[in-house]
Amino acid sequence: MASRSGLSACIITYNEADRIEACVRSVGFCDEVIVVDSHSTDATRELAAALGARVIERDWPGYRSQKQFAVDAAGSDWVLCLDADERVSDALRQEVEQLRAGGFAGYAGWSVPRITDYFGRFLRHGNAYPDRLIRLFDRRRGGWIGREIHENTRVEGRVGRLRGHLEHYSYRSLTDHHNRMQKYADLMAQSLYAAGKRCGLGKVLFNPQWRFFRGYVLRLGFLDGWRGLVFALVESNYVRRKYLHLYIRCRGLPS
């Protein structure tokens, strides 16, 4: 019979005092909680430490590098990775605990469906759901890869699918959502250009429309009511800004 596996929760933070407590409490079932903080100026570190988390301060190198640092600092081979604006639901916790009891036998990782809270209600359609991510994995067989923005995980071996939700409480307001997506668009354009990617006018004109149509119509985002419409419009603006900035950069102009 397989023995119970150890499990470390890995979280990265910067000025998340209003959300870190709920996040840390949601992973209280783990053997340890690691918080890697990039010099928050609020009470993030103190609040996390008060709940028993092991807090490590580190300069900000980018999303992928910071998340991988947290994984490397884990004391267990199995890790559960989440952001400060995410929480493990009760259903997901129960699933993970059942898997731990069996030592996660036969798997290198598990994907979880992330569900986003948008103005007080979870989005259940469109491009926002189900946002499947590999967040539970054996760090000996996987880790964080990709660019420093829109990073992801990759594991070598069998990946299972969990049903319990990872709850995402990301956007404090419409302005916060808009500003954050504009920031991500600029960073993504810079990353794509540095990687040698190029962009024609067609992507600037048509990719935003396709992103909106796919999410709002094909993936039934309209069933989320006005929230689904607003989310799809902000997404479309993100795609437009990303390709517009890449298009400008490709022509040797400052973006």
Question: Residues of each region from the PLM?
Answer:
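Cell-envelope/extracellular polymer assembly enzymes that use nucleotide-activated donors
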Residues: G6-S8, E32
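Short, well-formed alpha-helical segments that are part of the catalytic scaffolds
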Residues: I11-F29
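Acidic helix N-cap motif at the loop->helix transition within catalytic regions
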Residues: D18-E21, D42-L51, A91-L92
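A conserved acidic beta->alpha catalytic loop
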Residues: S26, D37-L47, D83
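Short, structured coil segments at secondary-structure junctions
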Residues: F29, A50-G52, G75, R132, ...
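Short acidic donor-binding/metal-coordinating loop in glycosyltransferase active sites
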Residues: S38, R58, S76, D83-E86, ...
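Glycine-rich, basic loop-to-helix element that forms the pyrophosphate-binding segment
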Residues: D59-A74
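Catalytic-site signature of metal-activated, phosphate-bearing donor transferases
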Residues: Q68-V71, W78, S89-S255
